[in-house]
């Protein structure tokens, strides 16, 4: 067993060896190294064919037309291209956007930028379960609403939003619907023929593909128009100029194909390991699961251990690679904005740990994780005066703390 045990699959996944092998064939003089846009010789044709195959593999994952797949540098760029692209193209129709407070920073910060440009954004507050009711979205819609952007699976708590129902609502109101599917593509079955999604962001490195590559699904029926953010040679039907990175794209395509083929088997195993982990630690006193218990992605477990500081717990769990939020915000000492939006107080938000399980997690690793967590929580609480007060029956919320 390799230490530390990797339980941070929501931050990134290792590249599947089958994917790495495919990528290696697109780099050197012996491989498919040409520029896919070079139409005058075989090196270019071979690269173009490799990209076409990968485009079909990514399209197959979500049941899209390959012409609806635009390759980007990752889900962050896809989110930016979708939201800014729609806002700038349809600005004469309206300048109002609806999103939620628990979206990824790539969506929230893009919306903040649009606010600086004169757009208006409504940030919806989810229920304590993390779910956003469709009625709440409907109530926020206005005559000038042009876009709704709601993620399918939350990166911190793993809850699954009902994008089918939200899509129906948006389509009936003729409002464009964007879904950030970075955490769900390759893990949940997605069918854009039945789910009324207009734009969908996908990440390569969240599904055992390489970093630095992503895709944006752009619907053709109904046709969605975007204003490009990257200008140049007119690649990707003018939506995203720049020489296509064949090896990255081939890697993402192969990762998508494997994810589609292995999804059911992978998910059953991952869900079993997640349940094993939760059943192993849920009996620890004052331990709470964050987010809806039923509607959640199979690999995700966000747990608050009351009276334990998250940072000190992470240091105590040195044999486990876990996080106290998303990788994009864990550098800040602020409590998770996602957990705060669910109504957790600062103390509970600070005492939470995100465990995310994936394709290469083993039973042995989960057993070791359970023992490590139990031991660490016990040790930290023994040192905690707050835990002692709580055990003595003192209501900590009623205590008047002196400020020195």
UniProtKB/Swiss-Prot annotation:
Q: Which SUPFAM superfamilies match?
A: PLP-dependent transferases
Q: Where does [2Fe-2S] cluster bind?
A: 328
N6-(pyridoxal phosphate)lysine modification sites?
206
Subcellular compartments: Cytoplasm
Its pathway, per UniProt, is: Cofactor biosynthesis; iron-sulfur cluster biosynthesis
Which GO terms fall under molecular function for this chain's record?
Answer: 2 iron, 2 sulfur cluster binding; cysteine desulfurase activity; metal ion binding; pyridoxal phosphate binding
Q: Which GO terms describe its cellular component?
A: L-cysteine desulfurase complex
- Entry EC no(s): 2.8.1.7
Q: Which domain of life is it from?
A: Bacteria
Residues of the active site are 328 (cysteine persulfide intermediate)
Q: Which cofactor does it need?
A: pyridoxal 5'-phosphate
Q: How does it assemble?
A: Homodimer. Forms a heterotetramer with IscU, interacts with other sulfur acceptors.
What the record says about family reads: Belongs to the class-V pyridoxal-phosphate-dependent aminotransferase family. NifS/IscS subfamily.
> Per its database record, what is this protein's job?
Master enzyme that delivers sulfur to a number of partners involved in Fe-S cluster assembly, tRNA modification or cofactor biosynthesis. Catalyzes the removal of elemental sulfur atoms from cysteine to produce alanine. Functions as a sulfur delivery protein for Fe-S cluster synthesis onto IscU, an Fe-S scaffold assembly protein, as well as other S acceptor proteins.
Protein name according to UniProt: Cysteine desulfurase IscS
Q: What species is given as this protein's source?
A: Shewanella halifaxensis (strain HAW-EB4)
């Amino acid at each position: 067993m390799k230490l530390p045990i990797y339980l941070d699959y929501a931050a990134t996944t290792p590249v599947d060896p089958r994917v790495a092998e495919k990528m290696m064939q697109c780099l050197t003089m012996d491989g498919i190294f040409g520029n896919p846009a070079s139409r005058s010789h075989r090196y270019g044709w071979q690269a173009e064919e490799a990209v076409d195959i990968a485009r079909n593999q990514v399209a197959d994952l979500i049941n899209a037309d390959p012409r609806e797949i635009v390759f980007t540098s990752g889900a962050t760029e896809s989110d930016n291209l979708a939201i800014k692209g729609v806002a700038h193209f349809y600005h004469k129709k309206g300048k109002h956007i609806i999103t939620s407070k628990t979206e990824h920073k790539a969506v929230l910060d893009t919306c903040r930028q649009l606010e600086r440009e004169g757009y208006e954004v409504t940030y919806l507050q989810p229920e304590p379960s993390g779910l956003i009711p469709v009625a709440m979205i409907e109530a926020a819609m206005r005559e000038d609403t042009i876009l709704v952007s709601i993620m399918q699976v939350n990166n911190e708590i793993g809850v699954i939003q009902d994008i089918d129902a939200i899509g129906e609502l948006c389509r009936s109101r003729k409002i464009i619907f964007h879904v950030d599917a970075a955490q769900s593509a390759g893990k949940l079955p997605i069918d854009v023929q039945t789910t009324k999604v207009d734009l969908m962001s996908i990440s390569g490195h969240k599904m055992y593909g390489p970093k630095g590559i992503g895709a944006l699904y752009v619907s053709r029926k109904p046709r969605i128009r975007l204003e490009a953010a990257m200008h140049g040679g007119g690649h990707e039907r003018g939506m995203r100029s720049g020489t296509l990175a064949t090896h990255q794209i081939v890697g993402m395509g192969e990762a998508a194909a494997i994810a589609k083929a292995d999804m059911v088997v992978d998910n059953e195993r991952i869900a079993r390991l997640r349940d094993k982990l939760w059943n192993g630690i849920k009996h620890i006193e004052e331990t709470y699961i964050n987010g809806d218990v039923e509607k959640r992605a199979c690999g995700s477990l966000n747990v608050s251990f009351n009276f334990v500081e998250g940072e000190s717990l992470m240091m105590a769990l040195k044999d486990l690679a876990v996080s106290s939020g998303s990788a994009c915000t864990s550098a800040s000492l602020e409590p998770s904005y996602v957990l705060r939006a669910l109504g957790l107080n600062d103390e509970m938000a600070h005492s939470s740990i995100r465990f995310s399980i994936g394709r290469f997690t083993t039973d042995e690793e989960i057993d070791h994780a359970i023992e490590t967590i139990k031991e660490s929580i016990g040790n930290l609480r023994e040192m905690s005066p707050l835990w002692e007060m709580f055990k003595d029956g003192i209501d900590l919320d009623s205590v008047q703390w002196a400020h020195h």
